A protein has these predicted regions:
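Bacterial N-terminal signal peptides that target proteins for export
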Residues: 1-8
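Repetitive helical segments and hydrophobic/amphipathic motifs
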Residues: 11-12
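C-terminal motif of bacterial Sec signal peptides marking the signal peptidase cleavage site
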Residues: 17-20
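Bacterial signal peptide processing site
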Residues: 22-24
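Non-catalytic all-alpha helical scaffold/repeat segments
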Residues: 27-28, 36-154
């Protein structure tokens, strides 16, 4: 008789544990609300020592799992602060530039895929900034995420 409650209790605990694991994996909560701080920045002595694009890309690498767990606001700031973001303008079109930079910085595609990215970017635009380059980035990113909605702006 004592075995039945013990087996039943064990089974129920396993079900609860398995359900918890599935929920965490499938419905990842975006809980990190601070953007990534890049350890090496343009204009520093460390940056000047990086002698190739590959070296700069490696120095700016952000763990995709970290970005995936960020709120959209934190991810947007991480993208805006990306030291190689200006490279999106180094091509004949912004679309080609974003495609190129997305090849070595996953943050752009992650931002593009967020359901609330357009709203988050628009909020940042509406808030305004004294930095004209930041505003240009925001407007470019706004056009980029609109492609997720099927309305390319490039």
């Amino acid at each position: 008789m004592k075995k039945i409650p013990t087996v039943l209790l064990t089974f129920m605990m396993l079900v609860v544990l398995c359900t918890g694991c599935t929920s965490e994996k499938d419905g990842k909560a975006k809980q990190i609300d601070t953007p990534y701080v890049y350890p090496i920045q343009p204009g520093t002595e460390e940056w000047a020592k990086l002698d190739s694009l590959d070296a700069k890309i490696a120095a700016c690498k952000v763990d995709p799992e970290l970005m995936d767990s960020m709120t959209t606001e934190a991810l947007l700031e991480t993208v805006l602060d990306y030291p190689l973001l200006p490279n999106i303008y180094a091509f004949s079109s912004t679309e080609i530039g974003i495609g190129s930079v997305s090849g070595y910085f996953e943050g752009l595609q992650m931002l593009h895929d967020r359901e609330d990215a357009a709203e988050c970017i628009q909020k940042a635009i509406d808030t305004g900034t004294d930095d004209p380059l930041r505003m240009q980035y925001l407007q470019t990113l706004a056009s980029y995420v609109r492609t997720r909605l099927g309305a390319p702006d490039f």
